[in-house]
Amino acid sequence: MSLSSRLCLLTIVALILPSRGQTPKKPTSIFTADQTSATTRDNVPDPDQTSPGVQTTPLIWTREEATGSQTAAQTETQQLTKMATSNPVSDPGPHTSSKKGTPAVSRIEPLSPSKNFMPPSYIEHPLDSNENNPFYYDDTTLRKRGLLVAAVLFITGIIILTSGKCRQLSQFCLNRHR
């Protein structure tokens, strides 16, 4: 069996085998919601603590809850900046402009979204409707397959390039000795 046929066979086996009946046991998300800053509808118990037969519903955010957590983060940031500006030793006071008509520079930085805030568009949808769909793949599976294909193509390209040069080099060496 030649090297290229072995590589093709390995590629086909590597792409087909992982997709046969393997589903993630517990879907995980890249983004996690901070339970202390987000408003939830109910206290949902941890799935590990409930009985294995009972399925819990996923946390679904509405626009009101998302904006509510944003306003909570804004008020928390405002309270922190008030506490920081109340210290007379470290705060020299607001900067006033020497030119007339120019407003004073504010020391409060614009509010950026917190690290733990998850916008509603990133929430994973329940897998119930997609479980029976054979063409459905989650992001982690697609990422792994993409990396596998890229690695195989990269190695194949290196083999093709080096084998061609080695062939040319060996012919060059054989012709030189004649």
Curated annotation (Swiss-Prot):
Similarity comment text for this entry: Belongs to the FXYD family.
One GO location term (cellular component): plasma membrane
Post-translational modifications: Glycosylated.
Keyword terms of this UniProt record: Cell membrane, Glycoprotein, Ion transport, Membrane, Potassium, Potassium transport, Signal, Sodium, Sodium transport, Sodium/potassium transport, Transmembrane, Transmembrane helix, Transport
Protein name, entry field: FXYD domain-containing ion transport regulator 5
Biological process annotations from GO: potassium ion transport; regulation of monoatomic ion transport; sodium ion transport
Annotated function: Associates with and regulates the activity of the sodium/potassium-transporting ATPase (NKA) which catalyzes the hydrolysis of ATP coupled with the exchange of Na(+) and K(+) ions across the plasma membrane. May increase NKA activity by increasing the apparent affinity for Na(+). Involved in down-regulation of E-cadherin which results in reduced cell adhesion. Promotes metastasis.
Side of membrane Extracellular, spans: 22-145
Comp. bias (Polar residues): 21-59, 80-100
Region (Disordered): 21-130
Localization annotation: Cell membrane; Basolateral cell membrane
Ranges facing Cytoplasmic side: 167-178
An annotated Gene Ontology molecular function: ion channel regulator activity
Membrane topology classification: Single-pass type I membrane protein
Species: Mus musculus
PANTHER family: FXYD DOMAIN-CONTAINING ION TRANSPORT REGULATOR 5, SODIUM/POTASSIUM-TRANSPORTING ATPASE SUBUNIT GAMMA
Known partners and oligomeric status: Regulatory subunit of the sodium/potassium-transporting ATPase which is composed of a catalytic alpha subunit, a non-catalytic beta subunit and an additional regulatory subunit. The regulatory subunit, a member of the FXYD protein family, modulates the enzymatic activity in a tissue- and isoform-specific way by changing affinities of the Na+/K+-ATPase toward Na(+), K(+) or ATP.
Pfam families the record matches: ATP1G1_PLM_MAT8
Signal peptide: 1-21
UniProt gene name: Fxyd5
Superkingdom field: Eukaryota
TM regions (residue ranges): 146-166
Biased composition (Low complexity): 67-79
Tissue and organ distribution: Expressed mainly in epithelial tissue, such as lung, intestine and kidney. Not detected in brain, liver, muscle, and heart.
